[in-house]
């Protein structure tokens, strides 16, 4: 791979998978990579947001996300990451960091060691509430709904943040699909995409995509229309709906 060239590093990882004796390396390439690129291009990070990946493996998608989103978000083009990936396995962490270094994207993507339920509160501690503009889940489908619930409870999700989940058919994320992608519970932006696995056209898998609507203010609660904050809000130009949509 050409050092400092993200596409070259990604192609090198894909070439490793193309070897018939090494199919064990499962990455979100091919049509899944196209979905990731489209999802990030239509929902860029704003100035105060970060991107999060849950489940890094060998760093393939972390490179793609850092390449697409790392120049945006909380620190712009500074030397601090705009995309943070969490991985539990120590060997995978070393490999992923090596690949990210090879793409020279260490300033855009960072790999954190740890168990995701224990790491999620750290995002709030370091970046504050409503700071996650994009989340990619690719760790354990039976935990997607729990980890999304943790993010919501901790107020991590920015208004209209985008959630993209991989492998929701195989191995599967049935409870996540039942809770967030069935009427009448699903938001109008929620879709499930049927794709084939990278280099395996006969193997179907799904990716789920949804945008998180802003939290609703309880009826009767003091909202932005009350007090000095409300007077300041009324002095601002009217909003024109969400900045991003699916």
Briefly describe each language-model feature range:
Residues 1-28, 42:
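Rossmann-like AdoMet
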Residues 143-246:
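C-terminal substrate-binding/active-site "lid" region of AdoMet-derived donor-dependent transferases
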Residues 64, 95-98, 121-124, 147-148, ...:
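Short, well-ordered secondary-structure micro-motifs
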Residues 56, 108-173:
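Active-site segment flanking the S-adenosylmethionine/decSAM binding pocket
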Residues 23-121:
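SAM cofactor-binding core of SAM-dependent methyltransferases
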Residues 43, 101-104, 127-130, 181-183:
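Short, hinge-like loop/turn segments at secondary-structure boundaries
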Residues 6, 10, 33-36, 62, ...:
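A general structural signal for well-ordered alpha-helical segments in protein cores
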């Amino acid at each position: 791979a050409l050092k400092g060239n993200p596409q070259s590093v990604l192609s090198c990882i894909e070439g490793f998978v193309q070897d018939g004796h090494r199919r064990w390396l499962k990455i979100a390439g091919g049509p899944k990579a196209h979905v990731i690129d489209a999802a990030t291009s239509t929902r860029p990070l704003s100035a105060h947001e970060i991107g999060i990946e849950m489940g890094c493996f060998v760093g393939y998608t972390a490179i793609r996300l850092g390449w697409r989103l790392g120049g945006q978000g909380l620190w712009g083009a500074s030397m601090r990451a705009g995309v943070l990936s969490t991985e539990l396995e120590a060997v995978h962490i070393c490999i992923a960091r090596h690949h990210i270094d090879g793409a020279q994207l260490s300033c855009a993507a960072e790999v954190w060691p740890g168990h995701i339920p224990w790491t999620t509160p750290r995002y709030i501690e370091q970046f504050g509430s409503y700071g996650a503009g994009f989340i990619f889940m690719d760790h354990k489908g039976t935990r997607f709904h729990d980890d999304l619930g943790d993010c919501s409870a901790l107020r991590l999700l920015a208004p209209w943040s985008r959630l993209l989940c991989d492998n929701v058919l195989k191995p599967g994320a049935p409870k996540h699909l039942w809770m967030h992608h069935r009427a009448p519970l699903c938001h109008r932006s929620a879709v499930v995409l049927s794709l084939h696995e990278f280099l395996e056209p006969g193997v179907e898998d799904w990716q789920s995509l949804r945008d998180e609507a802003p939290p609703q203010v309880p009826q009767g609660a003091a909202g932005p229309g009350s007090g000095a904050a409300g007077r300041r809000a009324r002095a601002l130009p009217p909003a024109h709906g969400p900045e991003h949509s699916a």
